[in-house]
């Protein structure tokens, strides 16, 4: 006969770790053809330089892609001096990557051709999918099913493309003509237009990128996949994200928490307001999450949140060039008082400390600074300070052990050679300590055009900003990230005495009886007891006499609170009366609550009152749970 066997599969830490490793390795292998292709087919390549297909081919050639290029166009024999092919099937050699810019109706055949020719990765530039409504979403679902059915991966649709600045690859598989300098930062953007702006800004600011991906509608490859690739990419030290939505927030949290332990992740989240969320939904067909949920997600996973793209770049420059601060003590060295005041204010507003230096350190500074200089911190060298004063001041402070980070504020007066000052800053920091170097950020002001000073500092990997608040903001966020990284991983405790099944039965019974809503006071007491959470004695009283009797039983002084499944904020309707010393006070409290509800025509909302003894000591807490449509259950926990 048949035998039925039931196996209980319990996840262990080791099992979960092995599963995550397999997922990571498989994801990295599947994304490699996007970033390290030996050959690229441009499907929809065109002789028209203004068309998307023409721009794609031009960008690949302008970047000097090191592999083979195959333009695909059924109506051309050659394009820009390259032999063209009528279809991907007609290409004589294997193509690792296909960049596709054809009308949506033509995509199914192109995907079949790519699969037949062994293409492993697709970048679909074409728009007209989930971002345009239900019909487009159905079209996107069919496209994704086809791509996955053939075992391929896809970036897009509705995207700008991607690039890799590795000198051995030099891939610009996008329709952006901008190829930024090579560097240690990788970025994923959910907006193609913002991607264009980011690439332009990166080139202007000399911000080196390792790779860039415009994910578009994220039908297949998402930021979650890219995080895993960049986690192991030796050319990537900092990860930048522009997010409008989270396809799978729990997976993002799991991956980001692990990656952020090794490499900083800086994210700008679009759609913070109702208007922004509506715009995000129509832009890439994505369900935008509530900002409170996003803030909690980033904070718990170590993701550094930037409020603007400008802030994203400011953080990126510092994280890519400087060590993380070991603490929150900041030393400010300046030649002007006003900027130092603004900087110090922003430091303290961001949770940083601007401590007064010790008498010993102040005496060392006084030995070479004029009597009018400020020595306490900020250190004001005054306007006449030269490069040597900056060098000596930084040497003393860096070696004092009284600062975890340095901010240098310089207002140009025209008399100081910019390059000499830049070198003095470098030398002062380097000669000040034999320990690990302190992070140093510079604000350089007062010049119409960028001079050799900021350029020299950038060459020395010392970030330069235009306004004094910016380095303070950057340090406050990098210090918070350093604190997060220093925290222990923690563990989930195993509670073996909880009767959670009883709690679930109580909740199901309440829903079956009355539908969705708030649990009654009696049911809530039972649920908390099932979870082994201690509850103060007392109970529900439906009448004034019951309330008086219950108060005698639990002992005075007592608290009387409205019991209601519909009134959530009891204090707003006078539903909480505290520190009642006798029976008469309890009766008056019952009447007061009842009469207030009657005055508001809400007497039917009163189920009675809860009577409990007053307690002292401990900490009053508030715990709440809500169900976010995207994130699932969210817990609010804090002071009551």
For each predicted feature, which ranges?
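Catalytic-core regions of core metabolic enzymes
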Residues: 1-640
């Amino acid at each position: 006969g048949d035998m039925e066997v039931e196996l209980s599969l319990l996840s262990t830490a080791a099992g979960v770790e092995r599963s995550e490793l397999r997922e990571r390795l498989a994801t990295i292998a599947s994304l490699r053809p996007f970033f390290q292709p030996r050959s690229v087919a441009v499907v929809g390549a065109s002789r028209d330089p203004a068309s998307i297909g023409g721009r794609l081919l031009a960008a690949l050639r302008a970047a000097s892609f090191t592999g083979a290029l195959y333009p695909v166009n059924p109506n051309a024999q050659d394009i820009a001096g390259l032999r063209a092919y009528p279809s991907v099937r007609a290409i004589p050699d294997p193509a690792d990557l296909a960049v596709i810019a054809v009308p949506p109706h033509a995509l199914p055949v192109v995907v079949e051709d790519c699969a037949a020719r062994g293409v492993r990765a697709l970048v679909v530039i074409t728009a007209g999918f989930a971002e345009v409504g239900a019909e487009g979403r159905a079209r996107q679902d069919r496209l994704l099913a086809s791509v996955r059915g053939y075992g391929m991966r896809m970036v897009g649709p509705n995207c700008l493309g991607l690039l890799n600045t590795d000198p051995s690859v030099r891939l610009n598989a996008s329709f952006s003509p901008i190829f930024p300098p090579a560097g240690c930062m990788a970025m994923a953007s959910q907006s193609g237009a913002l991607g264009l702006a980011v690439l332009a800004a990166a080139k202007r600011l000399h911000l080196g990128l390792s790779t860039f991906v415009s994910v578009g509608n994220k039908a297949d490859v998402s930021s979650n996949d890219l995080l895993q690739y960049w986690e192991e990419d030796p050319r990537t030290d900092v990860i930048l994200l522009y997010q409008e939505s989270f396809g799978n927030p729990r997976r993002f949290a799991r991956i980001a928490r692990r990656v952020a332990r090794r490499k900083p992740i800086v994210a700008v989240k679009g759609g913070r307001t109702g208007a922004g969320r509506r715009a995000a939904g129509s832009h890439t067909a994505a369900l935008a999450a509530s900002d409170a949920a996003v803030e909690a997600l980033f904070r718990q996973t170590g993701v550094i949140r930037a409020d603007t793209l400008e802030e994203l770049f400011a953080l990126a420059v510092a994280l890519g060039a400087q060590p993380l601060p070991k603490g929150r003590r900041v030393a400010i060295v300046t030649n002007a008082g006003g900027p130092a005041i603004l900087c110090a204010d922003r430091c303290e507003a961001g949770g940083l400390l601007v401590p007064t230096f010790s008498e010993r350190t102040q005496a060392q500074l006084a030995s070479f600074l004029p009597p009018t200089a400020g020595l306490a911190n900020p250190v004001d060298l005054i306007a006449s300070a030269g490069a040597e004063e900056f060098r000596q001041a930084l040497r003393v402070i860096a070696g004092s052990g009284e600062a975890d980070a340095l901010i240098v504020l310089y207002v140009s007066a025209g008399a100081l050679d910019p390059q000499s000052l830049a070198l003095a800053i470098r030398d002062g920091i380097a000669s000040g300590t034999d320990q690990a170097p302190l992070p140093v950020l510079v604000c350089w002001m007062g010049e119409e055009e960028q001079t050799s000073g900021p350029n020299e500092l950038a060459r020395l990997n010392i970030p330069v900003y235009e306004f004094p608040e910016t380095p303070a903001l950057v340090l406050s966020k990098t210090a918070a990230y350093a604190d997060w990284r220093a925290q222990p991983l923690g563990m989930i405790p195993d509670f073996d005495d909880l009767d959670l099944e009883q709690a679930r039965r109580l909740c199901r019974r309440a829903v079956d009886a009355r539908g969705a809503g708030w649990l009654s006071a009696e049911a809530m007491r039972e649920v908390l007891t099932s979870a082994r959470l201690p509850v103060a004695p007392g109970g529900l009283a439906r009448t004034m006499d019951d309330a008086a009797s219950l108060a005698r039983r639990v002992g005075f002084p007592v608290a009387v609170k409205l019991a209601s499944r519909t009134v959530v904020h009891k204090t707003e309707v006078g539903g909480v009366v505290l520190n009642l010393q006798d029976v008469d006070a309890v009766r008056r409290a019952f009447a007061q609550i009842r009469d207030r509800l009657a005055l508001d025509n809400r007497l039917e909302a009163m189920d009675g009152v809860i009577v409990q003894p007053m307690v002292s000591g401990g900490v009053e807490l508030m715990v709440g749970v809500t169900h976010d449509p995207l994130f699932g259950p969210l817990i609010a926990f804090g002071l009551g």
